[in-house]
Amino acid sequence: MAIPLSYNVRNLRLRKSLTIMTALGIALTVATAVFIMALLAGLGRAFGTTGDALNVLMLRKGSDSELAAGGVSRDAVEILKNLPGVAKNSKGEPLVSGEDILVVVLPRKGGTGETNVTTRFLTPIGIEMRPKVHIIAGRWFTPGQREVAVSSSINRRFDHANIGDTVHIGKGDWPIVGIFDASGTAHQSEIWGDLNQLGTDFERSIYSSVLVRATDPASAQALKNRANDDQRLELNGMLEPDYYASQTKSGAPIKIVGTIVAFIMAVGACFAAANTMYAAVAYRGREIATLRVIGFSRPSILTSFMLESLILSLLGAALGILLMLPFNGMTTGTQNQVTFSEVVFSLQMTPAVIVSAIIFALIMGVVGGFAPAWHASRRDILSALRG
């Protein structure tokens, strides 16, 4: 025979202060876990949604990053343009974009220091190959001019990043003529400028990377293999989504520190839950004995107290999730461990994050509640009745 759930709810309501304090402890732990998971989900979304399965990114052989690459020759780009399986635009131009990557230093808003920002130099074809990126204010840079467009995140997070301001690159100042939105992809952390003008300023005849659009998935794989095998090219080809997925190692420090903090807080929350349940057992000794006398078994009492602990943990989970809701979608940034420039992304409280938070809270409820529940189910009836 099972003890009614209403019995547990009534007892939690009778001890309001202790219930609230314990639920708040669990809530803060859950909120911390949600924050860390939302950060990682946001970072994963920024990199995971970047790229097209038909795009193949070519780097110099031995490189795993555009910034560290360099050395892709113009001759290699011309060879790539004439390979079978390369898509063309409506003008009949091969969708092959040689690109250069530099890092510039910008001051954060509020005087909170400076940080590195990735600056990508490309041609109009490179823009055409990224349909998720579009201008929301001003215009794109003019080919052959020292002009740049900045992402909306850069515009919000940094000083001197408005239309009309200038960014110092190489031999001169590059006016900002537009603001673009990159639909939450990794390009949301970038500044874009004209490739040919950069080559003139720096007298560069090589590219950091080359982006190639294939006509179909089979051609994309063939182009990737051709780049890796052709000794003339000396390139390392990879599908664009795979490249950006590999960049999620930027979240490793967040995951490590967050896991340690969440674990320490979880231990504290488990002790708080155990303390609450032990207090309930001590306070309700005669009740427990009476339940045994009228026919409730030890497993029923164990189950009842475990349910009470789980209800308490679910209450804490709900409070913790509610505490984090105002931060959902908040823009933040971290350092890319590959390029050492800032990656801008938004906190994402996805359904998976919320479900994980609830499971985390339930685990705390089980760990914190089992020992008191076991103690309650094993109490001697006569000694409990004597009080």
Descriptions of predicted regions:
Residues 16-43, 251-287, 310-319, 363-367:
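Hydrophobic alpha-helical transmembrane segments of multi-pass inner-membrane transport and secretion
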Residues 375-387:
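Short cytosolic juxtamembrane segments of multi-pass membrane proteins
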